[in-house]
């Protein structure tokens, strides 16, 4: 079989490319996905409130584990990644957060990335989005991905937690993806008007899969990329349970969109990466590229949990006898508790003056439970997810064998810098000040976790070591740039090779301030225009907030 383009990975970026490239009817595209379909009747992936379920199994989750993390009491930590049409947009928390404008302006200051400023990228965020309250300078109204905004009548804890953040002296913002990210406000979410998860399989592939010039093969595990000299010419993949590779060929390009864990792994198996590593596994070196699999970054977060004095939390919804009614309302009406991810309030703040833009993120949740659905507190409660945004810690992804079914060695090196510890100590102490504000007086019960006895730097550090978890935002392992550790250029083209691009979160040179999915989709949209030889969308002229010399916070209502 031969196609113009072969896309490896039907995830947040791969589905964007498959859809945009097949808009040109004379172009043929093959989309290979190692997982299966996104079954529309499976509530585990389609119901927003069920977001913890896919992380508990392996049907939709690669369920990677890290090597023992040396600064986290040698814990092996979860690294869930999506498997199936939609990729990680099929199993993520559905928070529609783009990051801060300064993240992209910061990328664009690096040599070779001048066309990645916020104003260059904003048109591509808008192109991908249909926001339920309509378009404006920051938001789209006719894109493939449905975005739902918060509505009146949602859980009263959201408004109370946002108000508490403002009472603690921080700004209020009405749109975390608009003029000003900094502050506390409502969070948009990847949910359709009918209350379904808005993955890229639903938003993009539902349109594209009707086209005769797109072929999708699921249960297709990529073994390696095929090369002739320095040119990528095809892909060898394993279909279903077969161990016999099938080869397909690309007339124009191979587009690697397998994500921050699998993309470097596939490159390494294919002979592209650090030559010393490849030689350990007798892999013929196609191109010695030392940055492949390096520069791994993530967001680490922890939960501060509180009992709730008013019976308004989601605790009753965790009981099996209440779930049939919730499920029926969601299934037939697309409304009710099932139709939300329940991350409807949050914020971004600067913990210290030295940060030019926010370095701490909050998600508020009106129940006390682990992200993966474990360890639910048997009482009405609420929690703040809080974590640092741009850790200086760096890790790596490295193959352990040539076997495409064997997971790679993943090490994030979480908390390897003093800055990490300072940010988390600050975050816990600031969160306690926020929770102590008058807006939460009628809701706030005792602190369940970490517990009021946890006060000294040493006690806080030990809590973080034992309890902090991934926010599931790995990136950076095939970074864009022009330095010796860069893997791709500003259009995703792999340095030193022809006919091969990487287009996914692995090309982010620096992690962004917030959840990754919206920006990964934007990357797909932007590079799709490069691949098609189209003139980039005109730069936006929208204004955006820069803190400058403004203080980090004002006077709290209650110290």
UniProtKB/Swiss-Prot annotation:
Essential cofactor(s): FAD
UniProt KW keywords: FAD, Flavoprotein, NAD, Oxidoreductase
One example of a Gene Ontology biological process annotation: glycine betaine biosynthetic process from choline
A single MF term (Gene Ontology): choline dehydrogenase activity
Assigned EC number: 1.1.99.1, 1.2.1.8
A Pfam short name: GMC_oxred_C
CC terms in the record's Gene Ontology section: membrane
Pathway membership, UniProt: Amine and polyamine biosynthesis; betaine biosynthesis via choline pathway; betaine aldehyde from choline (cytochrome c reductase route): step 1/1
Catalytic activity reported: choline + A = betaine aldehyde + AH2; betaine aldehyde + NAD(+) + H2O = glycine betaine + NADH + 2 H(+)
Record carries keyword NAD: yes
Catalytic center residues: 473 (proton acceptor)
Amino-acid positions noted as binding FAD in the UniProt annotation, renumbered to this chain: 4-33
Coiled-coil regions listed: none
InterPro entries named in the record: BetA (IPR011533), FAD/NAD-bd_sf (IPR036188), GMC_OxRdtase (IPR012132), GMC_OxRdtase_N (IPR000172), GMC_OxRtase_C (IPR007867)
S-S bonds: none
Described purpose of this protein according to its UniProt entry: Involved in the biosynthesis of the osmoprotectant glycine betaine. Catalyzes the oxidation of choline to betaine aldehyde and betaine aldehyde to glycine betaine at the same rate.
Family: Belongs to the GMC oxidoreductase family.
PANTHER family, A to Z: CHOLINE DEHYDROGENASE, MITOCHONDRIAL, GLUCOSE-METHANOL-CHOLINE GMC OXIDOREDUCTASE
Protein name: Oxygen-dependent choline dehydrogenase
């Amino acid at each position: 079989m031969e196609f113009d383009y072969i896309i490896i990975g039907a995830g947040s970026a791969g589905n964007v490319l498959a859809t945009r490239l097949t808009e040109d009817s004379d172009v043929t595209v093959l989309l290979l996905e190692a997982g299966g379909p996104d079954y529309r009747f499976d509530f585990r992936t389609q119901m927003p409130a069920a977001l913890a379920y896919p992380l508990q199994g392996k049907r939709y989750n690669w369920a990677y584990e890290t090597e023992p993390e040396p600064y986290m009491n040698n814990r092996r930590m979860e690294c869930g990644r999506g498997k199936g049409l939609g990729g990680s947009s099929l199993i993520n928390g559905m928070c529609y957060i783009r990051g801060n404008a300064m993240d992209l302006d910061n990328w664009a200051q690096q040599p070779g990335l001048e066309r990645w400023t916020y104003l260059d990228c904003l048109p591509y965020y808008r192109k991908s989005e249909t926001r339920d309250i309509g378009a404006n300078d920051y938001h789209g109204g006719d894109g493939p991905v449905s975005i739902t905004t918060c509505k009146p009548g949602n859980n009263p804890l959201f408004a109370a937690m946002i108000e508490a953040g403002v009472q603690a002296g921080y700004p209020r913002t009405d749109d975390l993806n608009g003029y000003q990210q900094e502050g506390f406000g409502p969070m948009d979410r990847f949910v359709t008007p009918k209350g379904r998860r808005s993955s890229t399989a639903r938003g993009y592939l539902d349109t594209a899969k009707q086209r005769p010039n797109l072929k999708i093969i699921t249960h297709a595990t990529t073994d390696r990329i095929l090369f002739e000299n320095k040119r990528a010419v095809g892909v060898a993949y394993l279909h279903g349970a077969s161990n016999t590779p099938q080869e397909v060929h690309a007339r124009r390009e191979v587009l690697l969109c397998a994500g921050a864990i699998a993309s470097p792994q596939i490159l390494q198996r294919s002979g592209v990466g650090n030559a010393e590593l490849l030689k350990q596994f007798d892999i013929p070196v196609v191109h010695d590229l030392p940055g492949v699999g390096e520069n791994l970054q993530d967001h680490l977060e922890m939960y501060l949990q509180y009992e709730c004095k008013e019976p308004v939390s989601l605790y009753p919804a965790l009981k099996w006898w209440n779930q049939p009614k919730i499920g029926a309302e969601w299934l037939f009406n697309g409304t009710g508790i099932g139709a939300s991810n329940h991350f409807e309030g949050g914020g971004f703040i600067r913990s210290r003056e030295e940060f030019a833009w926010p370095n701490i993120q909050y998600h508020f949740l009106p129940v006390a439970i682990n992200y993966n659905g474990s360890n639910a507190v048997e009482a009405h409660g609420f929690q703040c997810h809080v974590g640092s945004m741009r850790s200086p810690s760096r890790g790596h992804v490295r193959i352990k064998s040539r076997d495409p079914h064997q997971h790679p060695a993943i090490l994030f090196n979480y908390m390897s810098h003093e800055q990490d510890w300072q940010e988390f100590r600050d975050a816990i102490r600031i969160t306690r000040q926020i929770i102590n504000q008058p807006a939460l007086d009628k809701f706030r019960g005792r602190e369940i976790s970490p517990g009021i006895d946890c006060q000294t730097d040493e006690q806080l550090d030990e809590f973080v070591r034992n309890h902090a978890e991934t926010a599931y935002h790995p990136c950076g392992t095939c970074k864009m740039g022009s330095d010796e550790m860069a893997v791709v250029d500003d259009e995703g083209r792999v340095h030193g090779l022809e006919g091969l691009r990487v287009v996914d979160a692995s090309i982010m040179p620096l992690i962004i301030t917030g959840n990754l999915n919206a920006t990964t989709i934007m990357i797909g949209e932007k590079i799709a225009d490069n691949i098609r030889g189209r003139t980039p969308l005109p730069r936006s002229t929208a204004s955006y907030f820069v803190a400058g010399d403004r203080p980090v916070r004002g006077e709290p209502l209650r110290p």
